[in-house]
Amino acid sequence: MASKEFHIVVETGIHARPATLLVHTASKFTSEITLEYKGKSVNLKSIMGVMSLGVGQGADVTISAEGADADDAISTIAETMTKEGLAE
């Protein structure tokens, strides 16, 4: 299992466009990937799940992956979030 914490910096939080980007990135991997915020955990491959969390700017979230490609998944998602200016 691999996980990483992120601090959301994008002004609009994780709304439709960033959520779609994260779901698309997570869907490339076979591992189970979850997004946790305020004690709630959702499947990062589910757009509705991600949007339902209402993650705003300044939020701290944890993304976890479990499976054969967990380390690659977390690494790629972290790179995407940083490159797109979503989190640090």
Curated annotation (Swiss-Prot):
Catalytic residues identified in the record: 15
Residues recorded as bearing Phosphoserine in the entry: 46
Modulation of this protein's activity: Phosphorylation on Ser-46 inhibits the phosphoryl transfer from enzyme I to HPr.
Biological process (GO), any one: phosphoenolpyruvate-dependent sugar phosphotransferase system
Domain HPr: 1-88
GO annotations of cellular component type: cytoplasm
Keyword Transmembrane helix (UniProt): no
Keywords assigned: Cytoplasm, Phosphoprotein, Phosphotransferase system, Sugar transport, Transcription, Transcription regulation, Transport
Gene3D superfamilies reported for this sequence: HPr-like (3.30.1340.10)
Main subcellular location of this protein, as a coarse class: cytoplasm
Pfam families listed in its UniProt record: PTS-HPr (PF00381)
Places the protein is found: Cytoplasm
SUPFAM superfamilies reported in the protein's UniProt record: HPr-like
PANTHER family, A to Z: PHOSPHOCARRIER PROTEIN HPR, PHOSPHOCARRIER PROTEIN NPR
Role noted for this protein: General (non sugar-specific) component of the phosphoenolpyruvate-dependent sugar phosphotransferase system (sugar PTS). This major carbohydrate active-transport system catalyzes the phosphorylation of incoming sugar substrates concomitantly with their translocation across the cell membrane. The phosphoryl group from phosphoenolpyruvate (PEP) is transferred to the phosphoryl carrier protein HPr by enzyme I. Phospho-HPr then transfers it to the PTS EIIA domain.
The family this protein is said to belong to: Belongs to the HPr family.
Listed name of the protein: Phosphocarrier protein HPr
Gene for this chain: ptsH
